Amino acid sequence: MSSRRSSRSRQSGSSRISDDQISDLVSKLQHLIPELRRRRSDKVSASKVLQETCNYIRNLHREVDDLSDRLSELLASTDDNSAEAAIIRSLLNY
């Protein structure tokens, strides 16, 4: 068992990400998230960036769900053989 542990330690040690790489990734995330882009200050904690990123992803999921529901309702109200129905089905991946 200890040999397994030491093997794992070597593997994780070789694939560890540096603090500079983490800072770079957090900075890139900060520029991608609209809420953080709007802020005047460049100094935002990594935890805040990750929190806002998670919130942003949750909001995107909700938007996708809402749009999918709206498209489904629209599809239900169109003729199955119409061009509009074909387009909606392609958007919904049916």
Curated annotation (Swiss-Prot):
Lineage top rank: taxon: Eukaryota
Any GO molecular function: protein dimerization activity
SUPFAM superfamilies attached to this UniProt entry: HLH, helix-loop-helix DNA-binding domain
Signals that turn on the gene: Circadian regulation with a peak of expression at midday.
Annotated region described as Disordered, given as residue ranges: 1-20
Entry function: Atypical and probable non DNA-binding bHLH transcription factor that regulates light-mediated responses in day light conditions by binding and inhibiting the activity of the bHLH transcription factor HFR1, a critical regulator of light signaling and shade avoidance. Forms non-functional heterodimers with HFR1, causing liberation and activation of PIF4 from the transcriptionally inactive HFR1-PIF4 complex.
Assembly description: Interacts with HFR1.
Additional note from the record: Gain-of-function mutants kdr-D (T-DNA tagging) show long hypocotyls, pale green and slightly narrow leaves, elongated petioles and early flowering. They are not sensitive to the gibberellin inhibitor paclobutrazol during seed germination.
Family membership: Belongs to the bHLH protein family.
Name the record gives this protein: Transcription factor PRE6
Organism listed in the record: Arabidopsis thaliana
